[in-house]
Amino acid sequence: MSVTVRVPAKVNVQLAVGAARPDGFHDLANVFLAVSLYDEVTATPAADGLRVTCEGPDAGQVPLDRTNLAARAAEALAARYGRAPDVHLHIAKDIPVAGGMAGGSADGAGALLACDALWGTGASREELLEICAGLGSDVPFSLVGGAALGTGRGERLAELEVGGDFHWVFALAARGLSTPAVFREFDRLGEGLDLPEPVADQAVLDALAKGDAAALAVAVTNDLQPAALSLFPELSDTLAAGRAAGALAALVSGSGPTTAFLATDARSASDIAGVLRASGTCRDVRTAVGAAAGATVLD
């Protein structure tokens, strides 16, 4: 027997970042939107402990040891229910690695849900979310999907209404960016500044609720974008190429280096993707639609 769970990527349509806290984290107002790029995590019983394998374009960049969030999720669930984490976790990876789209977090949420189903632990949604929050700031949203406002360090979620489809184009960069490195650069750039408390922008929430891409395009923001561009200046060329191709909005996705472009509709997204592919400013281009469902057990 095995259990396979499909988990979406995310884009941040608002990422407001406060000053560093004493624990090193930052308070956030983080508006997540799940999009239709997916990893699949398959859990299969094993007699010899925990093992992680991976396939996909970026598989060589995925750690297969216990630093992988999928492995940590299985261990956390096993420890909570007093059992051995005897499982083989296989990740079919389509979400970019180190791309600012929560690919690692998706694998953690997927492994957690897959192991819960495989082992019959019957964990409640609240228990699963509690374990997710212990794994990382983005993991709870990977479990929930749809759209949500994350506060605290992003792990406290309030689900949001989405009134229609939003069409996106994602340009994948030639190399990754470390999320901790981007936050360190954010701190460096903001040294001496009095940063405001991060709050959700009502214009973003209203645009999502109405399914209004034009209104969302005006409202999207990412406080980490200057830090990502400081560490990876070439991303400015990708953003410019997408804007010139007709994107309603162009921004760095989360901590980057994936860049995200909001399109009017599916045809516009396809056109923008074609221009970006020909621009020479990125290694690959993907299109997706949001909001997508969260972690889902496949039949």
Swiss-Prot record:
GO molecular function, one term: 4-(cytidine 5'-diphospho)-2-C-methyl-D-erythritol kinase activity
Keywords: ATP-binding, Isoprene biosynthesis, Kinase, Nucleotide-binding, Transferase
Catalytic function, reaction form: 4-CDP-2-C-methyl-D-erythritol + ATP = 4-CDP-2-C-methyl-D-erythritol 2-phosphate + ADP + H(+)
Membership in a protein family: Belongs to the GHMP kinase family. IspE subfamily.
Binding locations of ATP: 96-106
EC number: 2.7.1.148
InterPro entries tied to this protein: GHMP_kinase_C_dom, GHMP_kinase_C_sf, GHMP_kinase_N_dom, IspE, Ribosomal_Su5_D2-typ_SF, Ribsml_uS5_D2-typ_fold_subgr
Pathway recorded for this protein: Isoprenoid biosynthesis; isopentenyl diphosphate biosynthesis via DXP pathway; isopentenyl diphosphate from 1-deoxy-D-xylulose 5-phosphate: step 3/6
Protein name, entry field: 4-diphosphocytidyl-2-C-methyl-D-erythritol kinase
Top-level class of the enzyme under EC nomenclature: transferase
Catalytic residues of the enzyme: 10, 138
SUPFAM superfamilies assigned: GHMP Kinase, C-terminal domain, Ribosomal protein S5 domain 2-like
Function in brief: Catalyzes the phosphorylation of the position 2 hydroxy group of 4-diphosphocytidyl-2C-methyl-D-erythritol.
One Pfam family, short name: GHMP_kinases_C
Single GO BP term: isopentenyl diphosphate biosynthetic process, methylerythritol 4-phosphate pathway
Organism from which the protein derives: Streptomyces coelicolor (strain ATCC BAA-471 / A3(2) / M145)
